[in-house]
Amino acid sequence: MREKTLRSEVLEEFATYLELEGKSKNTIRMYTYFLSKFLEEGYSPTARDALRFLAKLRAKGYSIRSINLVVQALKAYFKFEGLNEEAERLRNPKIPKTLPKSLTEEEVKKLIEVIPKDKIRDRLIVLLLYGTGLRVSELCNLKIEDINFEKGFLTVRGGKGGKDRTIPIPQPLLTEIKNYLRRRTDDSPYLFVESRRKNKEKLSPKTVWRILKEYGRKAGIKVTPHQLRHSFATHMLERGIDIRIIQELLGHASLSTTQIYTRVTAKHLKEAVERANLLENLIGGE
């Protein structure tokens, strides 16, 4: 019983430490979850024990990306305990850089078309994710006061890394938001709320996933919130938008994170060159 109480105290203090470090609520939730599992199994705050824990998770089928997240959580915990040398000994596993999967513009259109006209909230969720490149957590945390209707901007509060950013809203999307709000009858400060709950809590990421899964099935498309974000970036790049602007819109701290989309469009560029067929009359007969 005493051990359980001590663990709770450590987790609470660790969460406070992460908050002071500027970590987002989602990061704090994940880090404390993995630390609780680490402590529950009786591991000590050493790199050696951390490796044993990671090996156990890998054997359970955890992906390299998930393992990487656990490493980040444990490194933060070691630093919290003042064990900087142990933190340094932990190495992040190499994550293979895979091309993000994005929908085609035709698939996005098909997805929107299967949403019933009376499901105004659901339609707006899809339009916002695709039309602004928001992360699902950012969408759920969006408040009505974060939207500047006069100037046509929305402000993302405390995005990844705890940074705010401003995103322009296209006029058609702004009109959709106004139409949606005119039909709202609750007084929640959040732009999106749960429709099935009496107290109208803010929308959860789980609900967004469920909504997309439902309409994706109807459209015959596998779609996730992150895929819509990828699609936003890819389609912007394909239309000639500067990659640095896309970086700002996505809220990427590093340009290298955004540059993966230049690889996504390689196929698109190849097809364009082949369609142009500039050399047909020059070497076609050889």
From Swiss-Prot:
Q: What is its main location?
A: cytoplasm
Recorded protein name is: Tyrosine recombinase XerA
Q: Which Pfam families match?
A: Phage_int_SAM_1, Phage_integrase
Cited PANTHER family: INTEGRASE_RECOMBINASE PROTEIN MJ0367-RELATED, PHAGE INTEGRASE-RELATED
Q: What region holds the Core-binding (CB) domain?
A: 5-82
Name its GO BP terms in alphabetical order. DNA transposition
Q: What InterPro entries does UniProt report for this protein, alphabetically?
A: CB (IPR044068), DNA_brk_join_enz (IPR011010), Integrase-like_cat_sf (IPR013762), Integrase_catalytic (IPR002104), Integrase_recombinase_N (IPR010998), Integrase_SAM-like_N (IPR004107), Tyrosine_recombinase_XerCD (IPR050090), XerA (IPR033686)
The record's annotation in CDD domains points to: INT_XerDC_C
Q: Which GO terms describe its molecular function?
A: DNA binding; tyrosine-based site-specific recombinase activity
Give the source species.
Answer: Pyrococcus furiosus (strain ATCC 43587 / DSM 3638 / JCM 8422 / Vc1)
What GO cellular component term, any one, is given?
cytoplasm
Protein keywords = Cytoplasm, DNA integration, DNA recombination, DNA-binding
| Tyr recombinase domain location | 98-274
